[in-house]
Amino acid sequence: MSTKRELVLKAFRGEAVDRVPVGFWHHFTREDEWLKGFSNPEIIEKNLNGHKNFLHKVKPDFVKLMSDGYFAYPNPSIHKGLENISDLAGIEPLGADHPWITEQVELVKKIRAGFEEDIVAIYNIFAPVTYFKWLVGEVSGGDDLIANFFDQDAATLKKVLDTIGQDIASLSQRIIKEAGADGIYLSVQSIQDARVSQEVYKQVIAPSELHVLETAKEAGGVNILHICGYEGARNDIHLFTDYPAPVINWAVGPEGISLAEGREIFGGRTVLGGFENGKKGLLYTGDKAAIQAETKRIIAETGTTGLVIGADCTIPSDIDEERIEWVREAAAE
């Protein structure tokens, strides 16, 4: 019988496994705290304690370490209300030793120090364009601003994203090499504005995302690509087929693409997901029999290799965590 670490890494590589591993996660802080943790010990302590309690109660097969509190990338050149991308023509990276990066390295070290067993730990990272959207807009939104900036000056927008990407790559590298994370969970999302075509995305936005993933890979990371459908965002998952990550996760229902279909689109790579993540989904509302039946249906449809059972995205923080164990029980049968 494989250890949890062996089991998960085999699944990530698409090898035969003793049972299909399971991975679910949720936030440990409120949404209004996600952007406010930098140099705010109370929020970071809340996140730390949340991880400790979750790991003790759930004993997961592997864990996504949540970056709650560090959603705001603190580059002094960028501010809310920015109207002209040309104002950022002189933007510089924070640098690999900036406290925003170092604090996250320390966070991962502290979480891992409290592990009760040796499991794979993947750290949550957002795409450079997402950090940028949140600084000039809101946690959910800002896509129209990105499209505006593209219309104004695509070259400067690309420079801004590449600069942010340098820092996110440095963060990823240090998280893996210094803090001992096994890789990153990179959250990407199509821009929710028709002005940003697939071609524009690949030319202006994708290079910064690819740099982050490639840096994490070179640092030894085993990485997950999360194509995020938060609050109803829709994605063209074909945009991301050349992204170097061995495990792919997307919103199966909203995108209308099953795990089996997605695996083909991504050339046979391991797929993660299957369950809707929200409060209207089966995982949150269903009884044990229904949840276990759905688990078995997902496995029957997708196969036992190259599969990790999970959700479209982060599950509700108030979920009865026994439900995760129901999935794991069914996946082991």
Predicted regions and their residues:
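Active-site loop segments of alpha/beta catalytic cores
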Residues: 1-29, 36-37, 50, 61, ...
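Alpha/beta catalytic barrel-like cores
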Residues: 25-32, 52, 61-95, 99
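Surface-exposed strand-loop-strand hairpins of Gram-negative outer-membrane beta-barrel proteins
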Residues: 35-46
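N-terminal accessory beta-strand-rich subdomains and adjacent acidic, glycine-rich linkers
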Residues: 44, 50-54
